[in-house]
Amino acid sequence: MNETKEMPIIFNSEMVRAILDGRKTQTRRIVKRQYISHKQELRLCDDGYFYWWMKDAETHQPRRVSCPFGKTGDRLWVRETFQGPFVDYNDSHDLFKNPESYQKPENCIYRADCGQYPSFYDADDNLRQGWRAAIHMPRWASRITLEITDIRVERLNEISEEDAIAEGCYTDDEYGFNAQPRLWPCQKCQGDQTYAAYANGVYYVDCRECDTAKKRFKLLWESIYGFNSFDNKRVWVIEFKIIEKR
Protein backbone atom coordinates (compact mmCIF):
# COMPACT_ATOMS: atom_id res chain seq x y z
CA MET A 1 0.00 0.00 0.00
CA ASN A 2 1.46 3.34 -1.06
CA GLU A 3 1.84 5.88 1.72
CA THR A 4 0.67 9.44 1.10
CA LYS A 5 3.55 11.87 1.50
CA GLU A 6 3.70 15.58 2.23
CA MET A 7 6.22 17.96 0.67
CA PRO A 8 6.68 21.73 0.97
CA ILE A 9 6.27 23.94 -2.09
CA ILE A 10 6.98 27.67 -2.35
CA PHE A 11 4.62 30.19 -3.96
CA ASN A 12 5.01 33.95 -4.09
CA SER A 13 2.28 36.17 -2.69
CA GLU A 14 0.58 36.73 -6.06
CA MET A 15 0.28 33.01 -6.67
CA VAL A 16 -0.99 32.40 -3.14
CA ARG A 17 -3.79 34.87 -3.78
CA ALA A 18 -4.58 33.10 -7.06
CA ILE A 19 -4.77 29.74 -5.23
CA LEU A 20 -7.06 31.15 -2.55
CA ASP A 21 -9.25 32.77 -5.22
CA GLY A 22 -9.55 29.43 -7.04
CA ARG A 23 -7.81 30.79 -10.15
CA LYS A 24 -4.66 28.68 -9.85
CA THR A 25 -4.86 24.88 -10.07
CA GLN A 26 -1.53 24.18 -11.82
CA THR A 27 2.12 24.96 -11.30
CA ARG A 28 5.14 24.34 -13.50
CA ARG A 29 8.60 23.61 -12.11
CA ILE A 30 11.76 23.04 -14.13
CA VAL A 31 13.02 19.46 -14.53
CA LYS A 32 16.55 19.64 -13.15
CA ARG A 33 18.19 17.23 -15.59
CA GLN A 34 17.63 18.39 -19.16
CA TYR A 35 18.74 16.31 -22.15
CA ILE A 36 19.72 18.39 -25.17
CA SER A 37 18.33 15.97 -27.73
CA HIS A 38 14.77 16.68 -28.81
CA LYS A 39 14.45 12.97 -29.59
CA GLN A 40 14.28 12.15 -25.88
CA GLU A 41 11.26 12.58 -23.66
CA LEU A 42 10.10 11.73 -20.16
CA ARG A 43 7.17 9.33 -19.99
CA LEU A 44 5.12 8.10 -17.06
CA CYS A 45 5.18 4.30 -16.85
CA ASP A 46 2.92 1.78 -15.16
CA ASP A 47 5.07 1.68 -12.02
CA GLY A 48 4.27 5.35 -11.34
CA TYR A 49 7.72 6.67 -12.25
CA PHE A 50 9.00 8.64 -15.21
CA TYR A 51 11.72 7.30 -17.54
CA TRP A 52 13.70 8.79 -20.38
CA TRP A 53 12.64 7.38 -23.75
CA MET A 54 13.78 7.89 -27.28
CA LYS A 55 10.75 8.95 -29.27
CA ASP A 56 9.07 5.99 -31.01
CA ALA A 57 11.24 3.57 -28.99
CA GLU A 58 9.87 0.44 -27.31
CA THR A 59 12.24 0.47 -24.34
CA HIS A 60 13.46 3.11 -21.92
CA GLN A 61 16.61 3.85 -19.95
CA PRO A 62 16.89 1.86 -16.70
CA ARG A 63 17.19 4.93 -14.47
CA ARG A 64 13.85 6.21 -13.27
CA VAL A 65 13.04 9.86 -12.59
CA SER A 66 10.78 10.96 -9.75
CA CYS A 67 9.03 14.29 -9.52
CA PRO A 68 10.60 16.02 -6.50
CA PHE A 69 7.16 17.14 -5.34
CA GLY A 70 5.66 13.66 -5.17
CA LYS A 71 3.09 11.71 -7.14
CA THR A 72 -0.65 11.81 -7.72
CA GLY A 73 -2.43 11.66 -4.37
CA ASP A 74 0.46 13.14 -2.40
CA ARG A 75 0.07 16.45 -0.58
CA LEU A 76 1.86 19.77 -0.77
CA TRP A 77 1.94 22.28 2.05
CA VAL A 78 2.40 25.81 0.82
CA ARG A 79 5.29 27.94 1.97
CA GLU A 80 4.67 31.68 1.66
CA THR A 81 6.10 34.91 3.06
CA PHE A 82 4.77 35.43 6.59
CA GLN A 83 5.37 36.71 10.11
CA GLY A 84 4.41 35.28 13.48
CA PRO A 85 3.25 33.96 15.78
CA PHE A 86 1.56 37.07 17.19
CA VAL A 87 -0.61 37.20 20.30
CA ASP A 88 -2.47 39.81 22.31
CA TYR A 89 -0.37 41.83 24.72
CA ASN A 90 -1.93 40.08 27.70
CA ASP A 91 -0.77 36.72 26.34
CA SER A 92 2.77 37.80 25.45
CA HIS A 93 4.28 36.51 28.70
CA ASP A 94 2.77 33.08 28.12
CA LEU A 95 4.08 33.12 24.54
CA PHE A 96 7.66 33.15 25.81
CA LYS A 97 6.96 30.47 28.41
CA ASN A 98 5.03 28.15 26.10
CA PRO A 99 5.69 29.14 22.46
CA GLU A 100 4.57 25.79 21.00
CA SER A 101 0.96 26.39 22.03
CA TYR A 102 0.83 29.50 19.82
CA GLN A 103 2.40 27.93 16.76
CA LYS A 104 -0.73 27.93 14.61
CA PRO A 105 -1.67 29.58 11.29
CA GLU A 106 -4.35 31.68 13.01
CA ASN A 107 -1.56 33.44 14.95
CA CYS A 108 0.33 34.38 11.77
CA ILE A 109 0.11 37.24 9.28
CA TYR A 110 0.69 36.55 5.57
CA ARG A 111 2.10 38.96 3.05
CA ALA A 112 -0.37 37.73 0.43
CA ASP A 113 -3.09 39.32 2.56
CA CYS A 114 -1.23 42.59 3.10
CA GLY A 115 -0.18 43.82 -0.35
CA GLN A 116 3.42 44.82 -1.03
CA TYR A 117 4.26 46.40 2.32
CA PRO A 118 8.00 45.99 3.06
CA SER A 119 7.30 44.98 6.66
CA PHE A 120 4.49 43.95 8.96
CA TYR A 121 3.15 46.56 11.36
CA ASP A 122 0.23 46.51 13.75
CA ALA A 123 -2.74 48.87 13.79
CA ASP A 124 -1.11 51.22 16.32
CA ASP A 125 2.21 51.22 14.42
CA ASN A 126 3.91 50.14 17.64
CA LEU A 127 5.27 46.90 16.23
CA ARG A 128 7.23 46.63 13.01
CA GLN A 129 8.92 43.46 11.84
CA GLY A 130 10.36 42.38 8.53
CA TRP A 131 8.64 39.58 6.67
CA ARG A 132 10.03 36.07 7.04
CA ALA A 133 10.93 34.55 3.68
CA ALA A 134 8.81 31.67 2.41
CA ILE A 135 11.82 29.31 2.38
CA HIS A 136 11.96 29.62 6.18
CA MET A 137 8.27 28.89 6.84
CA PRO A 138 7.87 25.91 9.23
CA ARG A 139 5.12 23.36 8.73
CA TRP A 140 3.00 24.68 11.60
CA ALA A 141 2.68 28.12 9.97
CA SER A 142 1.35 26.82 6.66
CA ARG A 143 -2.34 27.59 6.12
CA ILE A 144 -2.81 25.90 2.72
CA THR A 145 -2.55 22.20 1.92
CA LEU A 146 -2.91 20.92 -1.64
CA GLU A 147 -3.46 17.46 -3.09
CA ILE A 148 -1.74 16.52 -6.35
CA THR A 149 -4.33 15.37 -8.89
CA ASP A 150 -2.03 14.87 -11.89
CA ILE A 151 1.64 15.10 -12.89
CA ARG A 152 3.08 15.15 -16.39
CA VAL A 153 6.12 16.48 -18.22
CA GLU A 154 5.97 18.86 -21.15
CA ARG A 155 7.95 21.63 -22.80
CA LEU A 156 7.39 25.03 -21.24
CA ASN A 157 6.31 26.63 -24.53
CA GLU A 158 3.70 23.92 -25.11
CA ILE A 159 1.35 25.43 -22.55
CA SER A 160 -2.20 25.88 -23.87
CA GLU A 161 -4.49 28.86 -23.37
CA GLU A 162 -6.57 26.86 -20.88
CA ASP A 163 -3.51 25.81 -18.89
CA ALA A 164 -2.14 29.37 -18.88
CA ILE A 165 -5.38 30.47 -17.23
CA ALA A 166 -5.13 27.54 -14.77
CA GLU A 167 -1.65 28.81 -13.84
CA GLY A 168 -3.29 31.85 -12.28
CA CYS A 169 -3.33 34.27 -15.20
CA TYR A 170 -6.50 36.28 -15.62
CA THR A 171 -9.10 35.18 -18.13
CA ASP A 172 -10.01 37.64 -20.87
CA ASP A 173 -13.10 38.77 -18.98
CA GLU A 174 -11.28 39.13 -15.66
CA TYR A 175 -8.36 40.84 -17.35
CA GLY A 176 -10.58 43.58 -18.75
CA PHE A 177 -11.40 44.72 -15.23
CA ASN A 178 -7.72 44.86 -14.21
CA ALA A 179 -6.25 46.69 -17.19
CA GLN A 180 -5.67 50.31 -18.03
CA PRO A 181 -4.90 51.74 -21.49
CA ARG A 182 -1.37 52.94 -22.23
CA LEU A 183 -0.09 55.22 -24.94
CA TRP A 184 2.81 53.29 -26.46
CA PRO A 185 2.11 51.04 -29.48
CA CYS A 186 1.57 47.31 -29.42
CA GLN A 187 4.80 45.66 -30.61
CA LYS A 188 2.90 43.30 -32.88
CA CYS A 189 0.20 45.37 -34.58
CA GLN A 190 1.71 48.83 -33.92
CA GLY A 191 -1.65 50.04 -32.65
CA ASP A 192 -2.16 52.17 -29.57
CA GLN A 193 -4.12 49.63 -27.54
CA THR A 194 -1.40 48.22 -25.28
CA TYR A 195 -2.65 47.52 -21.76
CA ALA A 196 -0.90 47.23 -18.42
CA ALA A 197 -1.89 44.90 -15.62
CA TYR A 198 -0.87 45.24 -12.02
CA ALA A 199 -1.51 41.72 -10.78
CA ASN A 200 0.44 38.46 -10.75
CA GLY A 201 3.70 40.18 -11.67
CA VAL A 202 2.52 41.20 -15.15
CA TYR A 203 3.34 44.79 -16.10
CA TYR A 204 2.68 45.01 -19.82
CA VAL A 205 0.96 43.02 -22.54
CA ASP A 206 -0.05 43.37 -26.17
CA CYS A 207 -3.30 45.01 -27.15
CA ARG A 208 -6.56 43.11 -26.77
CA GLU A 209 -6.51 41.91 -30.36
CA CYS A 210 -2.99 40.49 -30.02
CA ASP A 211 -3.02 39.40 -26.38
CA THR A 212 -3.32 35.76 -25.21
CA ALA A 213 -3.32 34.00 -21.85
CA LYS A 214 -0.11 32.25 -22.93
CA LYS A 215 1.62 35.62 -23.39
CA ARG A 216 0.47 36.70 -19.96
CA PHE A 217 1.88 33.46 -18.53
CA LYS A 218 5.21 34.10 -20.28
CA LEU A 219 5.47 37.49 -18.59
CA LEU A 220 4.45 35.95 -15.28
CA TRP A 221 7.13 33.25 -15.64
CA GLU A 222 9.84 35.80 -16.47
CA SER A 223 8.81 38.00 -13.54
CA ILE A 224 9.64 35.03 -11.27
CA TYR A 225 12.57 33.34 -13.02
CA GLY A 226 14.15 36.27 -14.86
CA PHE A 227 14.31 37.76 -18.34
CA ASN A 228 14.55 35.24 -21.21
CA SER A 229 13.81 32.32 -18.86
CA PHE A 230 10.85 31.24 -21.01
CA ASP A 231 13.23 29.11 -23.07
CA ASN A 232 11.28 25.89 -23.61
CA LYS A 233 12.85 23.69 -20.96
CA ARG A 234 11.08 20.54 -19.85
CA VAL A 235 8.91 21.21 -16.83
CA TRP A 236 6.91 19.24 -14.32
CA VAL A 237 3.25 20.14 -14.74
CA ILE A 238 1.61 19.63 -11.36
CA GLU A 239 -2.16 19.89 -11.10
CA PHE A 240 -3.69 20.21 -7.65
CA LYS A 241 -6.74 20.99 -5.58
CA ILE A 242 -7.07 22.66 -2.19
CA ILE A 243 -7.90 20.27 0.64
CA GLU A 244 -7.26 22.69 3.52
CA LYS A 245 -7.01 26.45 3.95
CA ARG A 246 -7.04 28.23 7.29
Where are these regions (language model features)?
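Secondary-structure transition motif
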Residues: 1-246
